[in-house]
């Protein structure tokens, strides 16, 4: 049994993971959906990391899954606790000394989104419409629930440089979604390659994939966990 530690995207709480958590528990795993102080203007990335470490407690066999802006917190958690695996899901891959606020300009994000809008023939209004960019795979009732459970996101953790000088010593994989309209997949492929030196895994789905495809996401996470953790773990006998 593994313990999946789920670190949410910006402006999200444990509810975001509820469908995925059910899938993982059905497979026999423990799940910690971290409740970050995202609306607290006094809280920075160190406070986010503290919240995750407290939630983990004395659990072991950790698989840390950090989505989107959560990718700034996931490696910090793995610097504090021993994790068997870190999975960055549709991630804002951080770089040493770069603040999350600087990430957008430093990665060429705006140009990638503009190129996507031109390919898709979207108007500027469509490119800013959450129903087009985020919720295009979700049924109306789930969109309503997602909107009702959204949280305010403080700008404080975006202001200070990411503190790690080097990536933590943890097996790391990136999982991208080919239908992601917020972080276009070609943009993330290059970012993951440039910053982590790895080839990402991919699956179908849009950015809020834990809501739109929880079963498929659980399957992919389990495939990655088995590849990394069970192969690396020596067999008795």
What residue ranges belong to the model's regions?
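Active-site loop/oxyanion-hole signature of alpha/beta-hydrolase fold enzymes
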Residues: 33-63, 101-109
């Amino acid at each position: 049994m593994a313990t999946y530690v789920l670190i949410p995207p910006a402006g999200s709480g444990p509810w975001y993971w509820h469908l995925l958590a059910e899938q993982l528990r059905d497979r026999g795993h423990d799940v910690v959906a971290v409740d970050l102080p995202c609306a607290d203007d006094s809280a920075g990335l160190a406070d986010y990391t503290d919240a995750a470490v407290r939630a983990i407690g004395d659990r072991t066999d950790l698989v840390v899954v950090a989505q989107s802006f959560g990718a700034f917190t996931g490696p910090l958690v793995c610097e504090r606790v021993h994790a068997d695996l870190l999975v960055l899901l549709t991630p804002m891959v951080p770089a040493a000394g770069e603040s999350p606020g600087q990430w957008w300009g430093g990665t060429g994000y705006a140009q990638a989104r503009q190129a996507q809008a031109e390919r898709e023939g979207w108007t500027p209004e469509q490119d800013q419409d959450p129903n087009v960019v985020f919720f295009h795979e979700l049924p109306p009732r789930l969109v309503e629930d997602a909107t009702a459970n959204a949280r305010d996101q403080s700008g404080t953790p975006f202001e200070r440089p990411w503190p790690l000088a080097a990536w933590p010593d943890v097996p790391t994989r990136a999982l991208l979604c080919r239908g992601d309209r917020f972080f276009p997949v070609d943009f993330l492929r290059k970012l993951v390659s440039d910053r982590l030196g790895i080839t990402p895994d991919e699956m179908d789905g849009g950015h809020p994939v834990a809501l739109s495809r929880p079963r498929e996401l659980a399957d992919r996470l389990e495939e990655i966990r088995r590849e990394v953790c069970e192969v690396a773990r020596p067999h008795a006998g």
